Amino acid sequence: MSTEGKEIKKQEEEYSASNIQVLEGLEAVRKRPAMYIGDIGEKGLHHLVYEVVDNSIDEALAGHCTDIDVTINEDNSITVKDNGRGIPTDFHEKEGKSALEVVLTVLHAGGKFDKGSYKVSGGLHGVGVSCVNALSTLLIAEIHRDGKIFRQSYSKGAPTSPVEVIGTCDDRGTTITFKPDGSIFTLTTEYKYDILANRLRELAFLNKGIHLNLLDKRQRDENGEYVGDHFYSEEGLKEFVEYLDATRGQAITESIIYIDTEKNGVPVEVAMQYNDSFSENVHSYVNNINTIEGGTHLTGFRRALTRTLKKYAEDSGMLAKLKFDINGDDFREGLTAVVSVKVAEPQFEGQTKTKLGNDEVSAAVDQAMSTALSHYLEENPRDAKAIVQKVILAATARHAARHAREMVQRKTVLSGAGLPGKLADCSSRDRSIAEIFFVEGDSAGGTAKQGRDRNFQAIMPLRGKILNIEKAQEHRMWENEEIKNMFTALGVTIGTEEDSKALNLEKLRYDKIIIMTDAYVDVSHIATLMLTFFFRKMKELIENGHVYIATPPLFLVKKGQQERYCWTEKERDEITAEMGKGVHVQRYKGLGEMNSHQLWETTMNPDTRILRKVTIDNAAEADRVFSMLMGDEVPPRREFIEKHAHYANIDA
């Protein structure tokens, strides 16, 4: 290499205070935390961890880090340790203090804004570790760099000690320990292991070759060891698709179609496989962010998939006898795919700022997909034939489903008063206050009708068993009486101007859709069937925050005239101990065991009830869990139930 070449390489790889760029100050974070981390509930609490982990992932993407350790400490503080270069600690000329202090106290300060340090960087809000610092009562940064160990502590964003050298070392890396501020995270400061595990697993698939470790010092396994997991993927998205497909139907192609290339300066990675299920399972990412609302990368993927497969199908003569057109939806039925792109300056838009807007990315993904998929189809004629046959089946089923759906939707529109007979509607026509309870069984439905506030609460009893959407073709759905009644009661239809499969919410009649089933486990199966239906066919209701689960109490604790309701066994034990001797405990096995006044007070009264909002924080994981719980494969379902049995209210 020439002297000039060496100098350029040296400049690129040097990472010091001069690389740290500052965009704005920290003052506003504690005043308006939701603006910076999304919310101040459970989601925002876990987002703090992601912000710190994203810094380490950026180091890994730049080729400087291979191991990231996340520890939940006994006091619910978090420690994130990596073996990257270590945050610079030298003096920052412009800011007049240590670069470490700049990174930890100035919002949007960091190497990710200096293109010589990082080509791309992850993280949706991208506010960095300074935001975590502002929202923590304690933050300790320990840097191993240049043979020394540097340490500095903070509280609520302000330093409580200078940058100190506390020892020597022969390794390198950054360790951040922080404790979230309970005065800001008032709902909870307790971290959920599964939420962090799901995100770290996802990051391992999206960034092959990185070791991610999770350790929970709050709980031990049967051997007395701390509970923990190690996430590592050698093949990245290929293994991600295998993981997602493990609980779905039988694969119809022999191998996973995999693309890893760069087009127009945009790295594009895609893995996809077809199976014999009936739902589309496509997940897209930009710089490790799950783009729930899609965007230009997904548009490019879908366009190339449809065009390339359609051309192959037409050229092979397999569509000759088909009497109706096939469309893009048909090419995606039974498809599991992950699309991941890295974009230097992503533009996010949409309701949740998770929709990619960069136009150049669409063309890059389209080109990458078209080229690779054409080669694959030519080289694997057996797989190509199986895919086209699947597409023809999907088109035939869609045609039948459209006819059945139109019959249902036309009947509702023409008959005018086409509401189901068993719906006890509310008197208010103000959608913003109206709510509907879907109640299992006639007896509970009767009690709910008596207990409700007729002004704004509607009751819809569900008599028969709801169809398991996971195993059924769409035309079967439109033949199911309970599902037809649910569509009619809600007032929604399928099909918008932009998307024939999207849910049209214009005529939605209720703001809150509440699933109300008995508290014991057999009946929660009905709730799961309903959630599967909403997730697969009415996902927009969940995404727009309309779906809730009612939480009836499990116990009534009585002593004389005193009555207390309990929602958990822990609560029951505490109240029983508090009341002393002579306590009578009643366990509710069903909603029908409560009278209408009790049901109103505990489960339906907006002032006293507990409603659980259904959200999709991790779409890929939600997809996998629904496929597992409602699909045909028994072993993974049994394993999942055994692992999560302690969360269930099992009546033994």
What are these regions (language model features)?
Residues 1-19, 26, 50, 58-60, ...:
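GHKL-family ATPase ATP-binding module
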Residues 31-50:
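Conserved short strand/loop->alpha-helix "switch" segment adjacent to the catalytic nucleotide/phosphoryl-transfer site
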Residues 92-93, 100:
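Short adenine-binding "F-helix/F-box" segment of the Bergerat
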Residues 103-105, 109-115, 301, 476-491:
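Surface-exposed acidic, glycine/proline-enriched linker/cap segments
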Residues 396-415, 430-436, 446, 450-452, ...:
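C-terminal interaction appendages of subunits in large macromolecular complexes
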